[in-house]
Amino acid sequence: MDIRALITVDPDILGGTPVFTGTRVPVESLFDHLEAGVSLDEFLDDFPSVSKEQAITLLNTASKLLTSKNIEQLYAAVA
């Protein structure tokens, strides 16, 4: 799944907050829930407009970014 098909950033949707495409669910909410100890299945129950494929693809993409040899680019992007 292409990242652009996974995440939408649109100023007309939640003021440009990155959301799961086709939803109004902020991407950050998945990480917030997991950090709070909520399981992926519970998150999906709370946000039925997010598909399991979307959530897993996002987590896999984040993992690849954080374990990539190009992590310096990530550091620069969030600086």
Ranges and model annotations:
Residues 1-25:
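N-terminal first-folded block
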Residues 17-19, 25-27, 71-79:
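Short, surface-exposed, charge-dense and proline/glycine-enriched linear segments
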Residues 50-78:
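C-terminal structural segments of small proteins and small subunits
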Residues 18-20, 25-61:
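Amphipathic, hydrophobic secondary-structure cores in small proteins
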